[in-house]
Amino acid sequence: MTNNLSGYRNKFVRVKTSKKRTVSSSNWLRRQLNDPYVAKARIDGFRSRAAYKLLEIHEKFKLFTPNMKIVDLGAAPGGWSQVASKLIKASDNNLNNKIISIDVLEIEHVAGVEFVQKDFFEADTEELIIQALDGRADIVMSDMASNTIGHKATDHIRTLLLCEQAFEFALKVLKPSGHFIAKIFRGGAENELLHKVKREFKTVKHFKPSSSRSESTEIYLVALNKK
């Protein structure tokens, strides 16, 4: 199982105080050093702990199969693209599988992944992606979140707006029966978006992977079978 952390739970690591480091930076560093999924990702060769979230989503919903076309929005540092590549058995020589990863930040090459360094909000991105896919996508996935400021309501709205834009993008590039996966933060304002998604997909589920930090309000919207 992807959430088997045997051997990854180490003794608690304390972070020494530093005048050059803010309290929030110290808290983030402490959390990273004591997070078993961070340690597991390092050993398993994944670029981020977020890889395990997508693995759990796949275990729950069985979304990925060989010979798929996938778009990964906001892909950096590439953890989700790595997982998708493994699950569909992508390789640089296999033309039946296509993964297009988009981000304004550069990511290192992943086998079977074509990286587009671009903001997906730009007007020409949709047509560019369709051309790169040579058709429509089976899955559009987004683990994007806005930079958090610690104010839950603001963080909720900002990430929800990203999800809405990813959803509108997905409607344009997904084939019928395609799937959409995206991160949202719970906060009350997501209901309107959920109604929109339910009108466009046959099945819509919420899922919180065990690899998602318990204190986080993040959940994943899993929309199956575009109408």
UniProtKB/Swiss-Prot annotation:
Active site location: 183 (proton acceptor)
GO cellular component entries: cytoplasm
Chain sites annotated for binding S-adenosyl-L-methionine: 78, 80, 103, 119, 143
UniProt GO molecular function: rRNA (uridine-2'-O-)-methyltransferase activity
This protein's record includes keyword rRNA processing: yes
Compartments, record wording: Cytoplasm
Name of a matching Pfam family: FtsJ
Keyword NADP: no
Keywords: Cytoplasm, Methyltransferase, rRNA processing, S-adenosyl-L-methionine, Transferase
EC annotation from Swiss-Prot or TrEMBL: 2.1.1.166
Top-rank EC class of the record's enzyme: transferase
Protein name per Swiss-Prot or TrEMBL: Ribosomal RNA large subunit methyltransferase E
Organism (species): Rickettsia conorii (strain ATCC VR-613 / Malish 7)
Source organism phylogeny: Bacteria, Pseudomonadati, Pseudomonadota, Alphaproteobacteria, Rickettsiales
